[in-house]
């Protein structure tokens, strides 16, 4: 018989290497074959629900790391809630309308102009559904569970119908109206944009100071004076109809080298500096309040029309002259103040950003190119006082990345003003993980303008509006609901396939159409209205879901997007927020915190991680970052995730190997009969479990990541598993000591696998399949471990012992360096009290100290001769006495033989005798 044949070495089929890229798809196939997602729902049916509502990603393009971060976070949450017993269905969704799909088809060579609108829309739909299929596969490959066979899709007839009905309810409440207002207009997209579709980038613009001649000073200012305005958009000067001054600011008429100028008094020195005036020549002739200047008339610098001086509270002294160039057709503040004075709304720019004949000699010019022509003209007639160029933050189209303009066009609006206070109140009733999240959406709602909901495109949900022969708008609950019914039965393409009269209820008449003729609106709805209707089209529509949702979780850009549009439509129609809690995550940057881009060569995509390392590595990475802020990823960071994964896997494998011959039904030791060290680890497991559950409850996954590593490294690897080898391998199979440890090890591996399951979904399943005697067919069908109160006094005593043990390890390391010993089993520890700590009395409470120290011998004395003082006693390390046992490698002075096996310590002799 060989010595090793007498040892109880670990046995498990659980492989050391993960092989995740090949293994994970097989595990997912098993989930599908066993219908695990549905079984989880069935298990929890009738329990309280937890509804995380999926914000729909856009159905175009491959997944990026932002998609992965978002979907993995959601999956961690719903899996955890399911394992707590909540009924937590997850219905994924897709946003399918909008310009990017139109552009994608154009890039693919689809000739838009050669197709009818209905034909082009059918191609858009087919493209979107193809994109969904691709993204769906990739999301599932990340281990995301959900009802992927029945997702919600914004182009589906039942969804579009729900959206139309919601629109109708808002219209019934007077919240939908048509108006000609300046809105963000994208010449590159040829469409209006909502605030959520705007991003700011630096742009170089001309900065000019222009003089307007006074033509009627009303006896207040001299008729030969000039108002000075400052603007960075010279192209809007053809639309100028007024100069706005603040009623409460003080203005001055200044004489500068014989010329008279009117500017804000507080800005005089700034203007002087900007225009290179010597302040000594700046002579104040008169001063007056802005309200005194109201209705003074000035001359437009190059058109034969007046520019009226008016009052406006939006004028500031932050920059400029205090006299603001006002063009109601090209600015929101200008428009609002212009309404008070019945000023004309001039906007001589077409859909492409080209001047119309209303712009006179500038007709046919692109607005940005006209800047030079206009400044040249101002220079010629002497109105231009200064021209320079500045770089400033300027709104751009988030899709085309090109500058946008403010342009007055007839648009459909959803009123924010009428529901603003109600939305702010709903935000107050909403939970946020971080205060800044609440502040962000609160301020956005507080400060946002009216919501332009119309778009001049074709791929979207039509606005269900008709026009009578006399131009009257027809938008009644009867007509809107009839359109909704048509959409539900046929899809929204019917709008483009039928005449207006065939889309109205049968027998419909209107006094404005004596001949029975009608036309229909050609604009479509903003895509944010599409996705912002999901609480109606999904949460209220699907029986397994409920309204309001417990949680919305998206990227931080959605405070101005989906979070915003959803709460607006929900409060407008239901009087409450569609979400009880709001949570957001940051963007994914490279390892240095830079934005990922192909040009920098720093792009990492989910597909690459899945194929090279496995989805569980991506999921572990998600748990390792502070997702509330922007997060970083790189090959080096992923390598760190892989290293941590390997440690977790190997620890679980070691424990599996050492419980292979354990059956909890027959071998478990009652808690009261456990060895103290095992009872200590059981309590530490309970602490670890409670902390981990708390972190899950608080959505703190980085804390879980750190908690797991700490438990594995400090409690298991550095102590319990190392200590345990002498028990598990050496002791008799059914000995109380071995079964005591196995009882706790089994509990650790079961509970730890459950706690890791929401994050390491595939690995936890693989581990579960290798744990002996578990009943459930999947770890995802189990419940999270219960919180169990710990014996704090007992744990405190053992924590003190562990600190003492750290001192022993320090002493062993010194002895190792001094060549007194090699391995710790070559050591004898002698320990006693000192002025710091009464080790002698304390250690009387502990048995088998040599095993706990992983040494061959340990002796507790009153006073240690030649000892070294440590925090928890004086310690001396000497070489162990006797000879090494060939079986357990402990040193003993009582070696003997059993059969053919020599040099066995008394313990090993007793064990081997049972085997011979």
From Swiss-Prot:
Zn(2+) binds at residues 885, 888, 905, 908. InterPro entries: aa-tRNA-synth_I_CS (IPR001412), aa-tRNA-synth_Ia (IPR002300), Anticodon_Ile_BEm (IPR033708), Ile-tRNA-ligase (IPR002301), Ile-tRNA-ligase_type1 (IPR023585), Ile-tRNA_ligase (IPR050081), M/V/L/I-tRNA-synth_anticd-bd (IPR013155), Rossmann-like_a/b/a_fold (IPR014729). Transmembrane segments: none annotated. GO terms for cellular component: cytosol. HAMAP family: Ile_tRNA_synth_type1 (MF_02002). IleRS has two distinct active sites: one for aminoacylation and one for editing. The misactivated valine is translocated from the active site to the editing site, which sterically excludes the correctly activated isoleucine. The single editing site contains two valyl binding pockets, one specific for each substrate (Val-AMP or Val-tRNA(Ile)). PANTHER family: ISOLEUCINE--TRNA LIGASE, MITOCHONDRIAL, SOLEUCYL-TRNA SYNTHETASE. NCBIfam families: ileS (TIGR00392). This is Isoleucine--tRNA ligase. It comes from Staphylococcus saprophyticus subsp. saprophyticus (strain ATCC 15305 / DSM 20229 / NCIMB 8711 / NCTC 7292 / S-41). The lineage of its organism: Bacteria, Bacillati, Bacillota, Bacilli, Bacillales.
């Amino acid at each position: 018989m060989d010595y090793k044949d007498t040892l109880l070495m670990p046995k498990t089929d659980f492989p050391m290497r993960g092989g995740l890229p090949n293994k994970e798809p097989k595990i997912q196939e098993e989930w599908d074959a066993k219908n695990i997602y549905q079984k989880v729902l069935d298990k929890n049916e009738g329990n309280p629900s937890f509804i995380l509502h999926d914000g729909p990603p856009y159905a175009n393009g491959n997944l990026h790391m932002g998609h992965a971060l978002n979907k993995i976070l959601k999956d961690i949450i719903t899996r955890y809630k399911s394992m707590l017993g909540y009924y937590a269905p997850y219905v994924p969704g897709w946003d399918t309308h909008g310009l990017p799909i139109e552009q994608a088809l154009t890039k693919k060579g689809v000739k838009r102009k050669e197709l009818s609108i209905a034909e082009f829309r059918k191609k858009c739909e087919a493209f979107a559904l193809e994109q969904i299929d691709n993204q769906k596969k990739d999301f599932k490959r990340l281990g995301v569970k959900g009802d992927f066979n029945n997702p919600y899709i914004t182009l589906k007839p039942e969804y579009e119908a729900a959206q139309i009905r919601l629109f109708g309810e808002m219209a019934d409440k007077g919240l939908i109206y048509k108006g000609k207002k300046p809105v963000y207009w994208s010449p590159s997209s040829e469409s209006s944009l909502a605030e959520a579709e705007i991003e700011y980038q630096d742009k170089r613009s001309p900065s000019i100071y222009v003089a307007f001649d006074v033509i009627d000073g009303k006896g207040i200012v001299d008729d030969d004076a000039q108002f000075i305005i400052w603007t960075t958009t010279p192209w809007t000067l053809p639309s100028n109809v007024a100069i706005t001054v603040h009623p409460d600011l003080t203005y001055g008429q200044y004489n500068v080298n014989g010329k008279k100028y009117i500017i804000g008094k507080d800005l005089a020195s700034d203007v002087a500096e900007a225009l290179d005036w010597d302040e000594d020549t700046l002579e104040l002739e008169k001063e007056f309040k802005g309200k005194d200047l109201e209705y003074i008339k000035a001359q437009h610098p190059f058109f034969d029309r007046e520019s009226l001086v008016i009052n406006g509270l939006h004028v500031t002294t932050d920059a400029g002259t205090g006299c603001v160039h006002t063009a109601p057709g090209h600015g929101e503040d200008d428009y609002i103040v212009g309404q008070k004075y019945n000023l004309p709304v001039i906007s001589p720019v077409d859909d492409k950003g080209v001047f119309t004949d209303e712009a006179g000699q500038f007709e046919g010019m692109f607005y940005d190119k006209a800047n030079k022509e206009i400044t040249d003209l101002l220079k010629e007639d002497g109105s231009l006082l200064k021209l320079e160029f500045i770089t400033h933050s300027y709104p751009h189209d988030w899709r085309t990345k090109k500058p946008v303009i403010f342009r007055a066009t007839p648009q459909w609006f959803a009123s924010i003003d009428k529901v603003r206070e109600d939305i702010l109140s709903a935000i107050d009733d909403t939970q946020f993980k971080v205060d800044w999240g609440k502040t962000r959406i609160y301020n956005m709602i507080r400060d946002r303008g009216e919501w332009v909901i119309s778009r001049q495109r074709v791929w979207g949900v039509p606005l269900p509006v008709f026009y009578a022969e006399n131009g009257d708008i027809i938008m009644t609950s009867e007509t809107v609901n009839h359109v909704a019914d048509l959409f539900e039965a046929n899809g929204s393409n019917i709008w483009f396939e039928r005449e207006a009269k065939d889309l109205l209820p049968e027998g419909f008449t209107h006094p404005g159409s004596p001949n029975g003729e009608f036309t229909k609106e050609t604009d479509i709805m903003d895509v944010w209205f599409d996705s912002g209707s999901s609480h109606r089209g999904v949460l209220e529509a699907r029986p397994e879901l409920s309204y309001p949702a417990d949680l919305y979780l998206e990227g931080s850009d959605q405070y101005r997007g989906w979070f915003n549009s959803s709460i607006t439509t929900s409060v407008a129609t239901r009087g409450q927020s569609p979400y009880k809690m709001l949570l957001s995550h940051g963007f994914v940057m490279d390892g240095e915190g830079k934005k990922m881009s192909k040009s920098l060569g720093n792009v990492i995509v989910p597909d690459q991680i899945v194929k090279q390392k496995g989805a569980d590595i991506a999921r572990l990475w998600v748990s390792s970052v502070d997702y509330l802020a922007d997060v970083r990823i790189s090959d080096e960071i992923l390598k760190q995730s892989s290293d941590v994964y390997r440690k977790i896997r190997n620890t679980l494998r070691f424990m599996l190997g050492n419980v292979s011959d354990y059956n909890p039904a027959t071998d478990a030791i009652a808690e009261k009969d456990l060895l103290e060290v095992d009872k200590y680890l059981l309590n530490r497991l309970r602490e670890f479990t409670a902390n981990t559950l708390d972190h899950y409850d608080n959505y703190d996954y980085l804390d879980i990541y750190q908690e797991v590593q700490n438990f594995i490294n400090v409690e298991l690897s550095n102590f319990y598993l190392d200590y345990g080898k002498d028990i598990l391998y050496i002791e008799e199979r059914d000995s109380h000591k071995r079964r005591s440890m196995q009882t706790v090890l089994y509990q650790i591996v079961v509970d730890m696998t459950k706690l890791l399951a929401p994050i390491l979904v595939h690995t936890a399943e693989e581990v579960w399949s290798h744990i002996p005697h578990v009943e459930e067919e999947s770890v995802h069908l189990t419940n999270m471990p219960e919180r169990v109160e710990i014996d704090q006094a007992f744990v405190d005593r053992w924590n003190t012992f562990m600190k003492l043990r750290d001192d022993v390890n320090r002493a062993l390391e010194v002895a190792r360096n001094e060549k007194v010993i090699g391995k710790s089993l070559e050591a004898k520890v002698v320990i006693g009290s000192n002025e710091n700590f009464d080790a002698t009395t304390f250690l009387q409470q502990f048995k088998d100290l040599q095993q706990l120290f992983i040494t061959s011998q340990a002796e507790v004395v009153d006073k240690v001769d030649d000892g070294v003082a440590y925090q928890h006693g004086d310690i001396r390390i000497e070489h162990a006495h006797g000879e090494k046992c060939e079986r357990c490698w402990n040193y003993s002075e009582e070696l003997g033989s059993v059969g053919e096996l020599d040099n066995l310590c008394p313990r090993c002799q007793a064990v081997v005798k049972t085997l011979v």
